[in-house]
């Protein structure tokens, strides 16, 4: 049985830990509020941009753009969004497990796919397993701007355009609520979902539709990546807030259990002392 001193040390250590996890929970909650607003405020922009680009693409007649055309797949790209830090529950493990299983099912050789990864956790995961990581970015701020990911988004679109891979999938945690995040797979390139839109609005274009598509389609694809990153950041802060709340609750429960053990041990020690005193007094009579 642990001594009173040992139990007291564990109680004090657990109290300090609970203070840390509570502080981290509050910080994550504050970051979540802002990240959630950022993600939601970006949605109207994306919806309108998709509408405009879709109408231009549908109205282009016989003109086609490489980013809209499905071609034979020789190599697949995977853009995976993770975090730079842990302590976020299953936030990273869920998306990484999904990507890992998908790659194992779809591909027989590393030559058939390439990985673009955002976040230190994902980068470490794929490097340890010798997966072909061709691009990565780490150290993004908690509230990233488009400029923070402009370079890697531009390169990802460029790798599709130059034929390095023939399709690009994006994996990230979609924010549903503060207690629910869902791993999401989205086919980023080619942009086949645009031409599936049957609604059209008539526009007059200057310069030509083809020239406008050359500019807008890469920007649209880059914006999809940024939108997913904002969504993933909200999910990250929510997952970390929940994980820290659970850790704090567990710490409080452990403190209650240890305090009960401490009181019982203390009571047993006092009872033992009284018994010894009574026994000694009886021996003197």
Swiss-Prot record:
Q: Which GO terms describe its cellular component?
A: plasma membrane; proton-transporting ATP synthase complex
A Pfam family in this protein?
A: ATP-synt
Annotated localization? Cell membrane
GO term, biological process aspect, one: proton motive force-driven plasma membrane ATP synthesis
Keywords, in A-Z order: ATP synthesis, Cell membrane, CF(1), Hydrogen ion transport, Ion transport, Membrane, Transport
> One MF term in GO for this entry?
ATP binding
Coiled-coil stretches noted in the UniProt entry, renumbered to this chain: none
InterPro entries to which the protein is assigned, alphabetical: ATP_synth_F1_ATPase_gsu, ATP_synth_F1_gsu, ATP_synth_F1_gsu_CS
Write down the membrane topology.
Peripheral membrane protein
**Taxonomy, superkingdom:** Bacteria
Explain the purpose of this protein: Produces ATP from ADP in the presence of a proton gradient across the membrane. The gamma chain is believed to be important in regulating ATPase activity and the flow of protons through the CF(0) complex.
Family under the similarity heading: Belongs to the ATPase gamma chain family.
- Quaternary structure note: F-type ATPases have 2 components, CF(1) - the catalytic core - and CF(0) - the membrane proton channel. CF(1) has five subunits: alpha(3), beta(3), gamma(1), delta(1), epsilon(1). CF(0) has three main subunits: a, b and c.
| Record's protein name | ATP synthase gamma chain
């Amino acid at each position: 049985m642990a001594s009173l001193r040992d139990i007291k040390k564990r109680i004090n250590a657990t109290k300090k830990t609970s203070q840390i996890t509570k502080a981290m929970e509050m910080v994550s909650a504050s970051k979540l509020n802002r990240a959630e607003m950022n993600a939601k405020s970006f949605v109207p922009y994306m919806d309108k941009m998709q509408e405009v680009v879709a109408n231009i693409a549908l109205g282009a007649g016989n003109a086609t753009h490489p980013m809209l055309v499905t071609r034979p797949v020789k190599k697949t790209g995977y853009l995976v969004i993770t975090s730079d830090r842990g302590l976020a529950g299953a936030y990273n493990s869920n998306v990484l497990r999904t990507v890992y299983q998908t790659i194992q099912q779809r591909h027989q050789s590393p030559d058939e796919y390439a990985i673009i990864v955002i976040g230190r956790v994902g980068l470490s995961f794929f490097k340890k397993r010798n997966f072909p990581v061709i691009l990565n970015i780490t150290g993004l701020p908690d509230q990233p701007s488009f400029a923070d990911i402009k370079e890697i988004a531009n390169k990802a679109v460029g790798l599709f355009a130059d034929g390095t891979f023939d399709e690009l999938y994006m994996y990230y945690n979609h924010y549903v609520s503060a207690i629910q995040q869902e791993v999401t797979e989205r086919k980023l390139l080619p942009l086949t979902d645009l031409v599936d839109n049957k609604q059209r609005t008539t526009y007059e274009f200057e310069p030509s539709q083809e020239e406008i598509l050359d500019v807008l389609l890469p920007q649209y694809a880059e914006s999809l990546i940024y939108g997913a990153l904002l969504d993933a950041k909200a999910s990250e802060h929510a997952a970390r807030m929940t994980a820290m709340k659970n850790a704090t609750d567990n710490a409080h429960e452990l403190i209650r259990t240890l305090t009960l053990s401490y009181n019982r041990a203390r009571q047993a020690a006092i009872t033992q002392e009284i018994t010894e005193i009574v026994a000694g007094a009886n021996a003197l009579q």
